[in-house]
Amino acid sequence: MKFVDEASILVVAGDGGNGCVSFRREKYIPKGGPDGGDGGDGGDVWLEADENLNTLIDYRFEKSFRAERGQNGASRDCTGKRGKDVTIKVPVGTRVIDQGTGETMGDMTKHGQRLMVAKGGWHGLGNTRFKSSVNRTPRQKTMGTPGDKRDLMLELMLLADVGMLGMPNAGKSTFIRAVSAAKPKVADYPFTTLVPSLGVVRMDNEKSFVVADIPGLIEGAAEGAGLGIRFLKHLERCRVLLHLIDIDPIDGSDPVENARIIIGELEKYSQDLAAKPRWLVFNKIDLLDQAEAEEKAKAIAQALGWEDKYYMISAASQTGVKDLCWDVMTFIIENPIVQADEAKQPEKVEFMWDDYHRQQLAEVEDEAEDDWDDDWDEDDEEGVEFIYKR
C-alpha cells in the first residue's frame, strides 16, 4: 500500500434543528397553552486513532465529511432527534491542524483516543421555553445554529523510540533489516528508500524498542533537494537519533563533510530536533582492516569535535550491532517518556456556539422584564417571533 503522510480534508458538523411554535389543541381544552418542542442538536465530527492504520491514503480520495443535521422540534413538546455523529479513523501518530487558523487541534498518540474537530450546532428552542406569568402565549422560538466547518490538515508522524539519520547509502535500511523483521528495499544506488519504515527490535521476551528508517538526506535538502526534509518530521517523537556514517564511501566522498551536511540540514529543519540525543555510528567497518577502521573512525570523530562515545558496526555482517542495540535499550529504559515531553494538547478547542444558549436565555429574560405589561392572546394576529435569527 502506498505510504501517504499528509492529507487535507473538510469536516462539517450538522446544523441544529429549529424550535417549534405550537399550542395545545384538544377537545374541551380550548386554551391548552404552548407545547412547541426544541430542535435536536447537530451531529459532531470526531477523529479516532486506530493502531491498525499506517497511512492516510484513504483521505486522498475521500475529502469531505459531514455530520447529520438535527431534526426540528414538533408539537406536544416533542424534541427533535439529534443528528448522527461522524467518526473518522486515522493512524496513531496523526497531528491535526486547522488550516484556517494554523492552530494545532491535537495529536492522536494513543489507540482509541478521540478528538472532536467540529461541533454540531445547538438546537433551537420551542415556544414552551418562553412561557411565563406575563407571557402565557409565547410566539417566540429560536432557530438552530450552524455546525462548525473546518479545513483540516492531517500529518502522520511515526511513533518510534529510535530514529536513523544519514546520507543515502549509509546503510540505514541494511541496519533495520539486521535488527528487526522489517524488510525495506536495499540496493547499491542512492535513494533506495523512498518512504519511512518502522521495525521492532526485540532484545528478549520483555524488552523491545521501535526504530524508524527515513530516506537519506543530501546537501540542500532544506531547500527541497533530493527528497527534501519532509520526512524529518517522523523523527520528532524519537528519544534518540542514530547518525549512521559510511566509514568508506563508495563514491569517494569525505565522511566528515557528509556528517556536517546532515547536522546542518537537521539544524535548518528544527532546533528542537537538532538538540535531541544523537549517537555517532560508523557503518561498513567490514570493508577495512580493524586497525584501519579504528584509526579512520577516531580521525572522523576528532574532525567533528565529537567527545562522546561512538560505535563501529557492520550492518551487513552484524558486527557490533547487538552491543549497540543493548546500549539503546538501556538508554530507553533509563530515559522514559515523561508527561512534559509528550505533545501538549490544547487546553480547550474553541467552537462557535459554546455559550450560545446561556447568552440567549439571559437576553430573553431581560426582554420579558421589559415587556411585563404586554397582554398577548393566542388569537392575536402577530406573527411568530424569531430570537437571534441568523
UniProtKB/Swiss-Prot annotation:
A Gene Ontology CC term for this entry?
Answer: cytoplasm
- Residues that, per the record, bind GTP: 166-173, 191-195, 213-216, 283-286, 314-316
Its localization reads: Cytoplasm
Required co-factors: Mg(2+)
Ranges where the OBG-type G domain occurs:
160-333
Q: Which UniProt keywords are listed?
A: Cytoplasm, GTP-binding, Hydrolase, Magnesium, Metal-binding, Nucleotide-binding
Which is one GO molecular function term here? magnesium ion binding
GO BP: ribosome biogenesis
Q: Where is this region: Disordered?
A: 127-147
Composition bias, Polar residues: 129-143
Query: Which Pfam families does the record associate with it?
Result: GTP1_OBG, MMR_HSR1
Q: InterPro entries under this entry?
A: G_OBG, GTP-bd, GTP-bd_Obg/CgtA, GTP1-OBG_CS, GTP1_OBG_dom, GTP1_OBG_dom_sf, OBG_GTPase, P-loop_NTPase
Domain spans labelled Obg:
1-159
Positions annotated to bind Mg(2+): S173, T193
Enzyme Commission code(s) on record: 3.6.5.-
Write down the PROSITE patterns for this protein, in alphabetical order: G_OBG, GTP1_OBG, OBG
Q: What does this protein do?
A: An essential GTPase which binds GTP, GDP and possibly (p)ppGpp with moderate affinity, with high nucleotide exchange rates and a fairly low GTP hydrolysis rate. Plays a role in control of the cell cycle, stress response, ribosome biogenesis and in those bacteria that undergo differentiation, in morphogenesis control.
Record text on subunit structure and interactions: Monomer.
**Family, similarity comment:** Belongs to the TRAFAC class OBG-HflX-like GTPase superfamily. OBG GTPase family.
What name appears for this protein in its UniProt entry? GTPase Obg
Supply the source organism for this entry.
Answer: Citrobacter koseri (strain ATCC BAA-895 / CDC 4225-83 / SGSC4696)
